[in-house]
Amino acid sequence: MSARVALDPLEAGVFGWFQWPPGRGRANAGVIVDPDGITLVDTLMTPEQWAPFAGEVEEIGLPVRRTVLTSSSVEFAGGTGRFKLAAIYGSAQASLHLDQPPNLESWQALYPEQAEGFAEVETRPVSHVVTSDVQLTPSTAVLTTGGQMSENLVALVEGAHMLFAGAMCSFGVTPLCWQGDPAGWADELDRLAELAPIIVPGHGPIGGVEDLRDQQAYLRACVAARGDPSTLPPGPWDLWADREHDVINVERAEMLAHGDSGIPPSMLRLAGLA
């Protein structure tokens, strides 16, 4: 179970929602306040997570106008149905995924602690497909990127020197790259490193460029492993949660190196599909 959390003020009009202990199934979210209303960055997963989050967001006293999805994964998009009047901004890939019927059995296999809550999860489709960088509000720019999936989004609050990286960053938690490109993800982190010194990841505590570089080194080590996770060298990741993701990340990198963009068999096993 996730520990009780609350909105964490990060800067004037900017809040984070950090789930503890960090790990798969316990993603973060962001709240950015503009004069016309609120922009959310991701919406958490099941009612146990998004109900208290929504309650605290409502206490701000402004309408939720916009939701930016950094990924289509249910960890980030599961609460979209709770914010029924918000416009949903996502990538074309996220839009495609969210138009498909949910796979409850896989969700329950991947996130067993939240298995009972998925019966109440109704994701909303993307209403605004983002294909290029855009200044969404006076405070927030939405930038296109990719790596965790082929197409991800991040939200930059330049005035707060803060990047809501969502699914693109995972600090203290092993990233999971079964539908993206570990090598391309590592390269794209170079661009994100230049955007802001403060980074709010999709999993784990708030961090900075040093944490991003640790993640980058891990992803490059997965590529260099050439399909054998036992050859991963020691590093900061030795202390990370969810090291069962290693085999998936290494397998995905090796499959892509040989022109195979299919789902890694190790991911199918984790999701209860093999």
Predicted regions: what is each one?
Residues 4-55, 154-167:
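Conserved beta-strand hairpin/beta-sheet module of binuclear metal-dependent hydrolase folds
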Residues 15, 68, 89, 128, ...:
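Hydrophobic/aromatic beta-strand patches that form the interior of the parallel beta-sheet core
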Residues 194-198, 206-274:
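Accessory terminal helices/loops
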Residues 47-90, 195-196:
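Active-site metal-binding motif and surrounding structural segment of the metallo-beta-lactamase
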Residues 92-96, 169:
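Short, acidic/turn-prone active-site loops that include or flank metal/cofactor-
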Residues 16, 39-42, 65-68, 141-142:
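Short catalytic-loop micro-motif centered on adjacent basic/acidic residues
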Residues 38, 45-47, 96-144, 146-222:
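Metallo-beta-lactamase
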